[in-house]
Design a protein with these regions (language model features):
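DUTPase catalytic domain/fold
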Residues: 1-149
Length: 149
């Protein structure tokens, strides 16, 4: 499978690296902040940070997911404002990363900082059938902790 990545800024590939897998076992590629100057997020503040890239997934059989970087969330309280970003196969615009500072201190994003992770995943578009009844299961309608601790 080929993922095409287009640089939308002259900084990409020079000052800011193209997304790549850091190790042979990596599931995600890092996305970097493509900004001209540092951006500070106050505690509780949200900001859309550009990456300077667009991608082309080969077909509707694939989507790209944008996840928070674990270190930012654990160490600084900086997460994605929408939980997980979904990039559909037909989207060709710039990838933007919505960040929110849930920590108690301001957090500064520097140009080129790794701010999120991109994962390409297979997609199944099922045939949707409206049903009067659903098959019974042992679990039934139990949710929100119903299967134990």
């Amino acid at each position: 499978m080929e993922l095409k990545i287009k640089a939308l800024s002259p900084k990409i590939g020079t000052e800011i690296p193209f997304p790549r897998f850091a190790t042979a076992g990596a599931a995600c590629m890092d996305l970097c902040a493509c900004i001209d100057e540092a951006v500070t997020l106050a505690a509780g503040e949200r900001r859309l940070v550009p990456t300077g890239i667009a991608i082309a997934l080969p077909s509707a059989d694939y989507a790209a997911l944008v996840f928070a970087r674990s270190g930012l969330g654990i160490k600084k309280g900086v997460c994605l404002s929408n939980g997980v970003g979904v990039i559909d196969s037909d989207y060709r615009g710039e990838i933007g990363v919505g960040l929110v500072n849930l920590g108690g201190e301001p957090y500064t994003v520097q140009p080129g900082d790794r701010i999120a992770q991109l994962m390409v995943v297979p997609v199944v578009q099922p045939t949707v059938t409206v049903a009067e009844d659903l098959d019974e299961t042992d679990r039934g309608a139990g949710g929100f902790g119903s299967t134990g601790r």
